[in-house]
Amino acid sequence: MAAAVAIEEQKKDIIFRSKLPDIYIPKNLPLHSYCFENISKFSSRPCLINGATDEIFTYADVELISRRVGSGLSKLGIKQGDTIMILLPNSPEFVFAFLGASFIGSISTMANPFFTSTEVIKQAKASNAKLIITQGCYVDKVKDYACENGVKIISIDTTTTADDAANILHFSELTGADENEMPKVEISPDGVVALPYSSGTTGLPKGVMLTHKGLVTSVAQQVDGENPNLYMHSDDVLLCVLPLFHIYSLNSVLLCGLRAGSGILIMQKFEIVPFLELIQKYKVTIGPFVPPIVLAIAKSTVVDNYDLSSVRTVMSGAAPLGKELEDAVRAKFPNAKLGQGYGMTEAGPVLAMCLAFAKEPFDIKSGACGTVVRNAEMKIVDPETGSSLPRNHPGEICIRGDQIMKGYLNDPEATARTIDKEGWLHTGDIGYIDDDDELFIVDRLKELIKYKGFQVAPAELEALLLTHPCISDAAVVPMKDEAAGEVPVAFVVKSNGHNITEDEIKQFISKQVIFYKRINRVFFVEAIPKAPSGKILRKDLRARLAAAALPTN
């Protein structure tokens, strides 16, 4: 009998929860209503600040313009459940378009404006976008497709030629609409509001259906409650330099900032000097970054010329941040708490958040990427058996809660592979939870290098490589090897004005790791390919290895 009980106990999931208590979340509210629920407290305060022009929109302005855009979209035939594509860099118009679509129950699919025409059109087709909002310089990418398929194009600025202008509407067509004529719609909490595209744990990009309830839950998990996990308030200024077409910026910067009544300083793209100037000029208090930005700050020689003392929070996400890089950037922001979050588009996206960011903060460890968010459950499972694992045992990270995606658009098979029958979303990331409930990411399940059966985590080697002063960036991927199966190889970007050889790099790593983690080859490159989120595009590097032998110098 005792043996049977023991076996039954083993079958039970070991579930981890936040140190913070669960809170009430108004899941019945549409996303826009939730974001503007407390607007009466800060309607006249700055909401959006355009870093390029210094133009300021108050909360009252943003809410009104978004309603007008919703009305304008409706006049152009966009109905509840229809999808619009936002093909824009960071800009106030991006925000107005997204919120305007939400007001009328429509869906926004966000695309990287630097995509090729083929990539943009593929997403437009897959999402069945009825209208594309873009800039004049990107119109040529979609013009022919739009004409052939009856898709309307709206440009936020002038178009490139008179011929284009005749067929393309200006954004003022939306902002000039009467907000009182916006249709009244009943929006279901399970209605889709955002459709970002993600490759998930494997395969081609797929539309991730994020609902009103899901995004409301995710934002609330971060910024709501008496002791918010991510403390923001109406005196804060958030620097929105990460692209809004990526869910990290859309959720944890824009939507969280709106809910908290903070000022959101919009920067179109990251350049170190304008970035530092804006922080100093607007006294930025919260900096949501990704590792490439953190790396640029840590390595920059001009940072010390600027007053960054206003920054109280530096949050990094989208990819793991090593302890050495954490320590380096701490020195640049004397008054800031530095910590990490962990997310995945399909998870809504935030799974874990650093508790040093809480209103009543907790002590944290370097290298940890937070504790599971409140109102959610996390477990770690053995990738081979699916059995849940106890603390300090690495396995695949799984999350369950109302914040996760509804599923992949028109792809029930991929949805079923990602979300199991019990509602657990399988991330494809390998990590463990320690004795203090902190989550540590080891690596991506599919990125682990197998050396004679030993697992080698690329992120670990990359963090070591970045500690060398002659290396400005690095990525590690597997290379096929007859004897070992796979061996680690490094792609390295040399720091300006520095020189280093392949042998020097190999020796530098060999002194710090066990034999099977040693770097086998080093390839020097001009840049490491990365997604807008900051994640290394390892498949591109693996493809280069497969295509041809690369010179080492």
UniProtKB/Swiss-Prot annotation:
Gene3D superfamilies: 3.30.300.30, N-terminal domain of ligase-like
InterPro entries: AMP-bd_C, AMP-bd_C_sf, AMP-binding_CS, AMP-dep_synth/lig_dom, ANL_N_sf
Chain positions covered by the region annotation SBD1: 271-340
UniProt-listed SUPFAM superfamilies: Acetyl-CoA synthetase-like (SSF56801)
Associated pathway: Phytoalexin biosynthesis; 3,4',5-trihydroxystilbene biosynthesis; 3,4',5-trihydroxystilbene from trans-4-coumarate: step 1/2
Single biological process term from Gene Ontology: phenylpropanoid metabolic process
GO molecular function, one term: 4-coumarate-CoA ligase activity
Stretch list, region SBD2: 341-408
EC numbers on record: 6.2.1.12
UniProt-annotated binding residues for CoA: K269, K452, G453
Amino acids binding (E)-4-coumaroyl-AMP: Y248, S252, A318, Q340, G341, T345, M353, K446, K450
Keywords: ATP-binding, Ligase, Magnesium, Nucleotide-binding, Phenylpropanoid metabolism
Catalytic activity: (E)-4-coumarate + ATP + CoA = (E)-4-coumaroyl-CoA + AMP + diphosphate; (E)-4-coumarate + ATP + H(+) = (E)-4-coumaroyl-AMP + diphosphate; (E)-4-coumaroyl-AMP + CoA = (E)-4-coumaroyl-CoA + AMP + H(+)
Cofactor: Mg(2+)
Residues engaged in binding ATP: S198, S199, G200, T201, T202, K206, Q340, G341, T345, D429, R444, K535
Group of enzyme by EC: ligase
Function: Carboxylate--CoA ligase that may use 4-coumarate as substrate. Follows a two-step reaction mechanism, wherein the carboxylate substrate first undergoes adenylation by ATP, followed by a thioesterification in the presence of CoA to yield the final CoA thioester.
Family assignment from sequence similarity: Belongs to the ATP-dependent AMP-binding enzyme family.
Domain notes: Both substrate-binding domains (SBD1 and SBD2) are involved in the substrate recognition, and are sufficient to confer the substrate specificity.
Protein name: 4-coumarate--CoA ligase
Organism listed in the record: Vanilla planifolia (Vanilla)
Gene: 4CL
